[in-house]
Amino acid sequence: MKNLIFSIFFKKISNSEKHVDRFNKLELHYNRLVQKKIDYANKIGADFRLYTNNDLYIDFGDKQSFNTDTSWSSFKNKYRDYEFDVLNLFKIHLLEKLAKEYDNVLYLDMDVIPNTKRNFFEEFDMNKICVRSINATTEVLPMNFQKHIKSGKKTYIDIIKQLDRYNEHVKALCKKAMLINQNIACKDYELVNTGIVGGNSNAISQLKFTDNLEHMLNVLKETKEEMFYDKDITDYFFPNNEVFFHYLLDKNNLNWFNLPEKWHKINYGSNDSKISNEYKKYKMIHLISKEFDELWKILDNNVEK
């Protein structure tokens, strides 16, 4: 069986202050973030590749090698209007491409830190797309927002106005609206986080993300024009890989598995999501907060089996 773990590290591709800060933190911790993934791949007998925005990927085999791959340039030129977000659309495109080369593939965002010796490919059924999904109701909003809604101090729309387009609840609403556009009932607020995605070649091929990308862009455009939700909500909708990914799971009733939190622990960096010694027990830690120094302090004293 040929197994691959891959990640993507791109130099700054957005002028947004928020994104620039995150790219800078990734660059600062680059060596350790890469080494953690190399070490994990070696432990479980998988190849590891790191893709860059120089149309190169680094193959960390017995002898580190640099290889040309123009997938990024081709994809970026086609979807250049989406700036930072084209990177997240691209990673799913690349997942599908690599699944044609390997039996099993695991994608890890650069800010995901493996913290286990256990083999992801053996732990879960690779016949299913393995990804963590969160039921992104208003219960996922920061506690102070939830309290305002429950107390009636602020309306739901007042709270929405204080969020941004990357909020999970907002993205779940976008997915629901797109499904409604296609006359598909959606009773939940489930939304995948694509920081960790795995599966075998056949499972990943069922997604057909790249094949359906133009379709999804058109559905999104129609959805925004229909304005099923309030304008303040609809204005947040944009081409997001997680929205599109879960839209396809629901629309096509695909076979997928919801990874347990132990294998995809997300840290957002809010007051409700502090890094603590509890993090030692998690197998994969996704630091959206980019608070790497805090995590290193804890993991340096951890011996995980």
Range-by-range predicted roles:
Residues 82-156:
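GT-A fold catalytic core of metal-dependent nucleotide-sugar glycosyltransferases
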Residues 1-90, 97-101, 236-238, 288-292, ...:
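N-terminal anchoring/stem segment of glycosyltransferases
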Residues 13-15, 57-61, 114-117, 122-123, ...:
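Short catalytic/ligand-binding loop motif for oxyanion handling, primarily in non-cytosolic enzymes
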Residues 296-305:
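C-terminal active-site "lid" helix and adjoining low-complexity regulatory extension at the edge
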Residues 168-296:
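Catalytic core and acceptor-binding pocket of nucleotide-sugar-dependent glycosyltransferases
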Residues 45, 102, 127, 194, ...:
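Short, well-ordered alpha-helix to beta-strand connector turns
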Residues 16-21, 60-82, 139-183, 220-231:
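Charged, glycine/proline-rich intrinsically disordered loops and linkers
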Residues 5-6, 47-52, 106-109, 130-132, ...:
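A structural signal for short, well-ordered beta-strand segments and their strand-loop junctions
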